[in-house]
């Protein structure tokens, strides 16, 4: 099941381990009330909710201790209390019972992905997974994936200058990618044509990663058949596919509208507007999701742990997924308010990532 180490938790408040059962129960009720309503909760309501009968005065004493520990705080407009980010992190890591998905929820994702199958592109499968994920979690669903997951259809070399050519890669999904290539001196047009023919005979239906492996083997075996300049063009072309910058990754977002539900104040609206901007421009979001690529299971970033200003009032729950070779090729998950239903969202993200891995043969 999901693995969620604390991510850069502000130093855990001293004395956390010493919280007795009564304090934990009161704290749990404060968090669960917040997750359900978004509103501060007072001692009178807590005393009605907890299993052990306690007077509001006794509850207030415990709440004062929890506040001292940095787990809850009093918003200036209310006599009630809300959990702090450190409190939410403590709840998620130490107190929360991770739920399980219903069979209907599992089927919802599974049947949608099965209908896509291998007949369509990886992007189509991810798109379906995200649509289901955002629907089930009522949050925005995101995926960070390598563009190289696209299966190739065709490659062409177009000469720009005597020593520069454009490599045009066309994917089966219609995606076109252009890269400029430096050519060795004296390359004739015939070498570009020969290189195109050699590559097209071997790359169709393969991802960039698969094509690279295939071509390294093919070049070793078929070197004698190829003109030396053609070999250099092919080697340079293959090298141009292996860039590791963020342009080689794409961010797909579905369910933006879910972020507009249940906003409590104007500042909430302003925060969501900034988040929309960041999701649109990818600023920082790619880096954030990239931090989860080497995780073993689900990673959770709460509030300011996100390191991205617009996400400071949000939570991000993500999990890596892998391809047929077991190599991690992307991250998927959800972005939503800090009062996400963590117990429900964590297994849903975990399940979606496993299904996508299975679809890719991982």
UniProtKB/Swiss-Prot annotation:
GO terms classed as biological process: negative regulation of DNA-templated transcription
Protein keywords: Repressor, Stress response, Transcription, Transcription regulation
Top-level lineage group: Bacteria
Pfam families in alphabetical order: HrcA
SUPFAM superfamilies xref list: GAF domain-like (SSF55781), Winged helix' DNA-binding domain (SSF46785)
A GO MF term: DNA binding
InterPro entries linked to this entry: GAF-like_dom_sf (IPR029016), HrcA (IPR002571), HrcA_C (IPR021153), WH-like_DNA-bd_sf (IPR036388), WH_DNA-bd_sf (IPR036390), WHTH_transcript_rep_HrcA_IDD (IPR023120)
Gene3D superfamilies: 3.30.450.40, Heat-inducible transcription repressor hrca homolog, domain 3, Winged helix-like DNA-binding domain superfamily/Winged helix DNA-binding domain
Family to which the UniProt record says this protein belongs: Belongs to the HrcA family.
PANTHER family, per the entry: HEAT-INDUCIBLE TRANSCRIPTION REPRESSOR HRCA
Task of the protein: Negative regulator of class I heat shock genes (grpE-dnaK-dnaJ and groELS operons). Prevents heat-shock induction of these operons.
HAMAP family, per the entry: HrcA
Protein's name in the database: Heat-inducible transcription repressor HrcA
Gene: hrcA
């Amino acid at each position: 099941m999901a693995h969620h180490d604390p991510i850069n938790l502000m130093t855990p408040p001293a004395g956390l381990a010493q919280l007795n059962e009564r304090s934990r129960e009161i704290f749990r009720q404060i968090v669960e009330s917040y997750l359900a309503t978004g509103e501060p909760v007072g001692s009178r309501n807590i005393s009605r909710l907890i299993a052990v009968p306690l007077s509001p005065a006794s509850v207030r004493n415990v709440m004062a201790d929890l506040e001292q520990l940095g787990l809850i705080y009093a918003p200036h407009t209310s006599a009630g209390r809300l959990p702090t980010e450190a409190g939410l992190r403590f709840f998620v890591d130490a107190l929360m019972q991770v739920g399980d998905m219903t069979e209907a929820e599992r089927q919802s994702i599974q049947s949608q992905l099965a209908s896509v199958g291998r007949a369509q592109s990886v992007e189509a499968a991810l798109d379906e997974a995200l649509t289901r994920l955002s629907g089930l979690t009522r949050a925005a669903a995101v995926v960070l994936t390598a563009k190289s997951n696209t299966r190739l259809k065709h490659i062409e070399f177009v000469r720009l200058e005597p020593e520069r050519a454009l490599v045009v890669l066309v994917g089966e999904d219609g995606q076109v990618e252009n890269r400029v290539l430096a050519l060795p001196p004296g390359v004739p047009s015939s070498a570009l044509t020969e290189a195109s023919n050699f590559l097209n005979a071997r790359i169709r239906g393969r991802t960039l990663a698969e094509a690279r492996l295939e071509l390294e083997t093919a070049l070793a075996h078929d070197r004698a058949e190829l003109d030396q300049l053609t070999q250099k063009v092919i080697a340079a072309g293959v090298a141009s596919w292996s860039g590791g910058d963020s342009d080689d990754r794409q961010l797909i977002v579905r369910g933006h509208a879910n972020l507009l539900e249940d906003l409590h104040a104007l500042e909430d609206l302003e925060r969501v507007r900034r988040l929309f901007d960041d999701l649109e421009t990818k600023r920082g979001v790619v880096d954030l999701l990239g931090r989860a690529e080497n995780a073993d299971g689900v990673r959770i970033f709460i509030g300011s742990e996100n390191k991205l200003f617009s996400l400071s009032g949000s939570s991000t729950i993500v999990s890596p997924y892998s391809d047929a070779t077991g190599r991690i090729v992307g991250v998927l998950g959800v972005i939503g308010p800090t009062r996400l239903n963590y117990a429900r969202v964590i297994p849903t993200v975990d399940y979606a990532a496993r299904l996508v891995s299975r679809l890719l043969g991982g």
